[in-house]
Design a protein with these regions (language model features):
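Walker A/P-loop
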Residues: 36-56
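Conserved Walker A/P-loop ATP-binding site and its immediately adjacent core
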Residues: 68-91, 199-203, 268
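Inter-Walker segment of RecA-like/P-loop motor cores
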Residues: 96-139
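SF2 helicase catalytic motif II
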Residues: 133, 145-187
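C-terminal helicase lobe and adjacent C-terminal extensions/tails of nucleic-acid helicase motors
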Residues: 273, 290-296, 302, 338-339, ...
Length: 599
């Protein structure tokens, strides 16, 4: 085991930390040495799960051998994919400094959007999203159907399914399908490690049931960090409940308590209001973080957490994006009420190095607008300040809390809230279970069944154009009646814009098929249109050779049924700049109200 510990030491030393020899690391390594095909790994936030799994693959690279063709690290969101990509790059650099190897390694990321070179999960190490992994694996990508290439990538790879709890939705849809996806990944030769801080017993049971017929070495008992043996090196967190609206007390909370401070709200609109309140009251060094800020700006703000020099008076106002991927020692946390597993993750942001205090607003109305009412009601019944504080470091306590909430009865009630979900779930399950039998049948035969392979909602890619370019596009549309307009701009400039100025707009299940989104609508000659940027291979004329040309697409409506079959739709919708907000001196507040009302 010393060889693995050497890798871990190199990684943590590079990050300015000292080595902690957690027992559960060796439990994981032993399970891999025993050639387990499926492993569940449960440990608290900040307990080194990533280093434990990286040590396995990086040790092989340093030694110049391969047990797996590659490593796929799978995460729920694009921002986490970028963060993990950078983290793995740093870990690899640390190994090169200490061991002089490996010399040549390809590390890539693939989040399903428009990337100049389509990697299809290529690379020695690839970070990717769950959606991208699965739609690539099953042969449904918006730009191609390279089915055998993606299946070949899965065979013999180490597949890390990280932050699984974030896939949970209001109808328990993704957790119901994921067990069958895991079964297929194992069936095609993958070694799967499921990593999470909170593992509901009912999900574990469903995964084990889905893989019971596979001839594979499945480790049925999760590898769990034992708090009596392994002590997480972090401060204690004192939890306090209060009955007021967090917006009403935000200013007083940050002024009266130690910093750095983190405030988490359940919606973008409320987070933006809090940010403005704190700025207006001159509360100090305030930053805003949520999912509807363009990618380049958001990445710059997230770099705060990677810098060695910490901003002691920092106040972060955020949404659910702060539940994972933030390694910062916040002394004070204030959050709105949310489901128990979400609360445990939020509390894990506090007291990473020293003791901290966490305040939880118990106003249920700010939670039930976002989360299933039955889950919030059950969470409130189980909440206890002392037990919640212990859940951050004690997996047994966090498991007890989670399992008290997510019972079969609660999940049944969650599904009842979404009309027609059982039929959709049945169709998707049938496709996943019968995938092997239908491997060489055209993917177009399964578009309806595969439209919701992981989520019921829809992700709309959007882009904010600079003012001059936006006016240029509007003029182009006003001068031409066509719904497909060649855009005379260098394709590399468009690709750069997509990388820096994009964001994703989430439309949850239950939205009507034809919707209106003022935030991405534009008035052209008195009519409303949606505008998309499409990049495709075209010929300028019959006599000319082909080239890649950007095109503006005009649409009078958005049909969610059509988009849901786009399987990773890559053509971004242009944002109406009137709906993208800024604070003083051009500070990005983001696409706060895409629906033209409370969002």
């Amino acid at each position: 085991m010393n060889d693995y510990w050497d890798i871990v030491e190199a990684i943590v030393t590079e990050r300015g930390r000292r080595l902690r020899r957690y027992r559960y690391f060796e439990d994981l390594w032993n399970a891999i040495e025993e050639e387990a095909s499926l492993i569940f790994l449960q440990a608290p936030t900040g307990a080194g799960k990533t280093e434990a799994i990286l040590a396995l693959f990086l040790r092989d690279l340093v030694d110049g051998k391969r047990r797996w063709h590659s490593m796929l690290h799978v995460l729920p969101t694009r921002s986490l994919v970028f963060n993990m990509f950078n983290r793995i790059c740093r870990s690899l650099r640390a190994c090169r400094i200490k061991f002089g190897r490996p010399s040549r390694v390809v590390i890539s990321y693939d989040h399903g959007g428009f990337i100049p070179a389509k990697t299809f999960l290529e690379g020695d190490v690839t970070t990717t999203t769950y959606d991208t992994l699965l739609y690539t694996f099953y042969g449904f990508r918006s730009y191609g159907h390279h089915l055998l290439l993606s299946i070949g990538k899965i065979a013999g790879s180490l597949i890390v399914l990280d932050e699984v709890h974030l896939l949970q939705d209001s109808s328990w849809y993704a957790p119901a399908l994921l067990p069958y996806h895991i079964s297929n990944l194992i069936k095609y030769g993958g070694t799967v490690v499921v990593m999470t801080a909170t593992l509901p017993q009912i999900f574990l049971k469903e995964v084990l049931n889905a893989v019971r017929w596979i001839d594979a070495n499945v480790r049925r008992d999760p590898i769990v960090m034992n708090s009596r043996i392994d002590k997480v090196e972090r401060g204690k967190v004192k939890v306090e409940f209060f009955d007021k609206d967090l917006l009403d007390v935000a200013v007083d909370l940050v002024k009266e308590n130690e910093k750095p401070a983190l405030l988490i709200f359940n919606t973008v609109e409320r987070a933006v209001k809090a940010y403005q309140l704190l700025r207006e009251n001159r509360c100090g060094d305030v930053e805003l973080l949520h999912s509807r800020i363009i990618a380049g700006v958001r990445r710059n703000r997230e770099e705060i957490f990677e810098k060695s020099e910490k901003r002691k008076d920092l106040i972060i106002v955020a949404t659910q994006v702060a539940e994972v991927g933030i390694d910062y020692d916040f002394r004070t946390l204030a959050t709105e009420l949310s489901p128990i597993d979400s609360l445990i993750q939020r509390l894990g942001r506090c007291g990473r190095r020293r003791d901290g205090v966490a305040f939880i607003s118990m106003k249920k109305e700010n939670a039930v607008k976002v989360y299933p009412e039955i889950v919030i009601e059950e969470t409130v019944k189980s909440l206890d300040e002392e037990r919640l504080g212990r859940s951050i470091t004690d997996v047994e306590v966090s498991s007890e809390l989670v399992n008290e909430i997510y019972t079969e009865e609660v999940i049944k009630n969650m599904r009842k809230a979404v009309k027609g979900i059982e039929d959709v779930l049945s169709d998707s399950c049938s496709f996943i279970k019968e995938f092997s039998s239908n491997l060489f049948i055209a993917r177009s035969s399964f578009e309806d069944a595969a439209a919701n392979l992981l989520r019921l909602g829809v992700e709309l890619p959007c882009i904010l154009l600079p003012d001059e370019l936006y006016r240029e596009v509007l003029d182009l549309c006003k001068e031409n009646e066509s719904n497909e307009l060649p855009w005379p701009i260098d394709v590399e400039d468009v690709i750069s814009l997509i990388e820096k100025n994009s964001l994703s707009l989430s439309l949850p299940a239950g939205r009507k098929i034809n919707i209106q989104l003022p935030g991405i609508m534009h008035e052209i000659r008195g009519k409303k249109f949606y505008l998309q940027i499409h990049i495709a291979y075209r010929q300028r004329s019959e006599d000319s050779s082909g080239e890649i040309l950007p095109t503006i697409l005009k649409r009078e409506r958005i049909n969610l049924a059509r988009i849901s079959k786009g399987f990773g739709l890559a053509d971004p919708f242009i944002i109406n700049p009137e709906y993208y907000s800024f604070y003083d001196e051009g500070y990005h507040l983001g696409l706060v109200k895409p629906y033209g009302r409370s969002s």
